[in-house]
């Protein structure tokens, strides 16, 4: 089908190009923009109305004028050349190699705007993914096919946590093909260098595909990048039978780009200036995670977002929480105490944890042990608040044990090194070690036979 070319550019507003008298432009259709000096840019149709096509430009609008600019409509939506050879490679936000390697010889070209997985086609997630981080594996377990976001704040170590998870994550069955698709949106050059160096130096890059969009890159790339990353994941998972962990950071930058484009289109804003359709837009990303009936592959998602002002009620974390299956919250208070990774286990939640733990998956005592650790840590934190008012001298001997437990739980269980990879057996064993400082008669949430089998209390 021949490309249709138009020279009827009527207006340029921010990253948008308005082309008049285009009768058959289609939503998401790709376009080629040729400047008067022969330079070319790419774009995508965002909207069509009464012959007017609104085109989002990939790149700067510098040099583009209403006179002498030719817009060619390709008659197809954005497609990604895709192959297993993408593993071990680094790409920009529109899928072009930026690591100095050769172009990808595509075995397929897949549309990047794939639909969410049909609920009827979904298989219930049930297999444990080990991250090597106790606060996640032991208390907020990640399950294959789940979408579990990380809520962080400015200056908190979410980048280090993302790199650590990408390096350490694995399924317990070593025969399974496991890989990571990593997508970063709106990051600084320093952060991009950090991620690429970490992936290369630790060997994680060999089983990873990286997509990087810098803060200086066009905002439209931030809209496209997660879709390109997920298209790559879908190919590897559902056509090659691999188990893919998709890490997307920072979804707040993605939503800021969505707001910028919405403002350029002069749409009526919703909460805090974000477009009213942001919930629907986010769902088209998050709902592409999961498992398909009759297919060996799976896609697990860990979107990372920074909460402006540490406000968990901000529209981005708020809407993300509605769509996803829990959240991992990084605490600024724990970070101030140098308790990396600083995960607040009481605010965190994995809604699919019960499907991925227990006998035959992790260990039979996992659920009861996690509940007991939650209860003991919550009691210890309550006693901290009380101690600030009445002093530690007013506490009973038993209360002091719980107060001490909260401190040791943070310093030994939550805190761990950046290169410390704890197995699930190590994590569960550490939990029993910490509980041994409390009276055994207080262990109401673990079964007596589990106490007998795994408990670390000294026998009198």
Curated annotation (Swiss-Prot):
GO biological process, one term: proton motive force-driven plasma membrane ATP synthesis
UniProt keywords, alphabetically: ATP synthesis, Cell membrane, Hydrogen ion transport, Ion transport, Membrane, Transport
Major subcellular location class: membrane
UniProt subcellular location: Cell membrane
GO molecular function: ATP binding; proton-transporting ATP synthase activity, rotational mechanism
Superkingdom of this protein's organism: Archaea
One Gene Ontology cellular component: plasma membrane
Keyword Membrane: yes
Assigned protein family: Belongs to the ATPase alpha/beta chains family.
Its job: Component of the A-type ATP synthase that produces ATP from ADP in the presence of a proton gradient across the membrane. The B chain is a regulatory subunit.
Protein known as: A-type ATP synthase subunit B
Species per Swiss-Prot/TrEMBL record: Thermoplasma acidophilum (strain ATCC 25905 / DSM 1728 / JCM 9062 / NBRC 15155 / AMRC-C165)
């Amino acid at each position: 089908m021949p490309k249709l070319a138009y020279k009827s550019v009527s207006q340029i507003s921010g990253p948008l190009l308005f082309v008049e008298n285009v009768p058959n432009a289609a939503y998401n259709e790709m376009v080629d923009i040729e400047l008067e000096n022969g330079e070319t840019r790419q774009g995508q149709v965002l909207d069509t109305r009464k012959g007017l096509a609104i085109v989002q430009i990939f790149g700067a609008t510098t040099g583009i004028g209403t006179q002498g600019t030719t817009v060619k409509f390709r008659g197809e939506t954005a497609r990604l050349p895709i192959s297993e050879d993408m593993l071990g490679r680094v790409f920009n936000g529109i899928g072009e190699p930026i690591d100095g390697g050769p172009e990808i010889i595509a075995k397929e070209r897949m549309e990047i705007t794939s639909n969410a997985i049909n609920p009827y086609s979904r298989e219930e997630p049930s297999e444990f993914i080990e991250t090597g981080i106790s606060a996640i594996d032991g208390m907020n377990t990640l399950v294959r096919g789940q979408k579990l976001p990380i809520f962080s704040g400015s200056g908190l170590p979410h980048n280090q946590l993302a790199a650590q998870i990408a390096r350490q994550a694995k399924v317990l069955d070593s025969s399974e093909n496991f890989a990571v698709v990593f997508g970063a949106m709106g990051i600084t050059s320093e952060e991009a260098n950090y991620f690429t160096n970490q992936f290369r130096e630790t060997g994680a890059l060999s089983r990873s595909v990286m997509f990087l969009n810098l803060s200086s890159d066009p905002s439209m790339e931030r809209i496209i990048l997660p879709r390109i990353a997920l298209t790559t994941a879908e190919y590897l998972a559902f056509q090659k039978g691999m188990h893919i962990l998709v890490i997307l950071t920072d979804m707040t930058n993605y939503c800021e780009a969505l707001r910028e484009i919405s403002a350029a289109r002069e749409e009526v804003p919703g909460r805090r200036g974000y477009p009213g359709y942001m919930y629907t837009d986010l769902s088209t990303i998050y709902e592409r995670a999961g498992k398909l009936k009759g297919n060996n592959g799976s896609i697990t998602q860990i979107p990372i977002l920074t909460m402006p002002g540490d406000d968990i009620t901000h529209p981005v974390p708020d809407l993300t929480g509605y769509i996803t299956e829990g959240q991992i919250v990084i605490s600024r208070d724990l970070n101030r105490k140098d308790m990396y990774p600083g995960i607040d286990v009481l605010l965190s939640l994995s809604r699919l944890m019960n499907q991925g733990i227990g006998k035959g998956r992790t260990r039979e005592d996992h659920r009861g042990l996690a509940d007991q650790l939650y209860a003991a840590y919550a009691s210890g934190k309550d006693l901290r608040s009380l101690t600030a008012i009445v002093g530690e001298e007013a506490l009973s001997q038993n209360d002091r044990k719980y107060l001490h437990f909260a401190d040791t739980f943070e310093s030994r269980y939550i805190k761990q090194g950046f290169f410390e990879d704890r197995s699930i057996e190590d994590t569960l064993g550490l939990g029993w070690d910490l509980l041994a400082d409390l009276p055994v008669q207080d262990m109401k949430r673990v079964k007596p036979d589990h106490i007998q089998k795994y408990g670390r209390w000294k026998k009198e």
